């Protein structure tokens, strides 16, 4: 295994961490106004992600930073050509921080309601756009190799398969509308439904009483649609765009996870339902990266214009230094993440919440008098 392939896999792992963890953060925000009937329930719903949402965003920062360092050509091509979509996602993430942090600053229900709506919108948009973005990476984008000096397109026959053209760069030359196709829109529906169900299961797992039961019932209604739409999109991707038979393996595992989650949810076991849904999303991300390989960005204009893992990678010296750093720090990050979820494993008792008291205090999200949220037992 070359260092470039190793880092392609490591970046996939970082995206797994982000989408599985931030996925339920988005889902909680999406259902906040639907599930929370009053201020007490909305505060309890928000408290489920209170200790974790900002830490979960670190996975995105790390994935972006790793891409910049390990695959600079991939980073520059993607960010320069899809900057509008990525800017909207970034803006939503910033606004969501304001919605969560500023919500309790004023003891006014009108103030809180407005920020709840902001939170909801800033959760829905990225949930859809992430799916559209990853579907574009699988389907292929309007990419050509262009001379940086005069903007002339390099003929496809002159583009080497294992190196970059001197004085030229891969560029997304199509407009924003070329990224909007039935396949990419279905990809947006996939992430939207998966995150909705992920959030509902997390609230069911982390709360008690009527709120937990209503969240579980919501998941039971969402799970069939999420599973069916994901299966349709994944089969479309595999049959039309994947160049590897190996990508069937994560596809089947993802399907098994989502179906198992659906069955566990129907049996009333929200812990196992959430754990299996987590597995389903994780292997859906594995499937996306397996379908992309050996490219990091596929060209819909001509296969010769596709940006491969080898072409996009940094020098081996850079990748070696990054590998040593990752071997030192990544286990610590994983250990801390697991520990933080263990510390705040207690379920949240809705009845113990004072609706007039703002903020997500530690006593609210870490109540030793409540049972812990376990995954299946």
Where do the protein language model's features map onto the residues?
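Hydrophobic alpha-helical membrane-insertion segments
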Residues: 122-139, 275-291
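Transmembrane helix-loop-helix
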Residues: 77-92, 217, 221-270, 275-276
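N-terminal signal-anchor module of multipass membrane proteins
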Residues: 1-55, 61-64
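Membrane-interfacial helix termini and the short, flexible loops that connect transmembrane helices
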Residues: 32-45, 70-77, 97-118, 205-215, ...
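Long hydrophobic alpha-helical segments that form multi-pass transmembrane helix bundles
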Residues: 124-201, 205-211
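Short, membrane-exposed interhelical loops at transmembrane-helix boundaries
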Residues: 299-321
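Membrane-interface helix-loop-helix modules in multi-pass inner-membrane proteins
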Residues: 52-127, 131, 137-144, 241-245
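Alpha-helical transmembrane segments
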Residues: 7-18, 79-93, 120, 178-194, ...
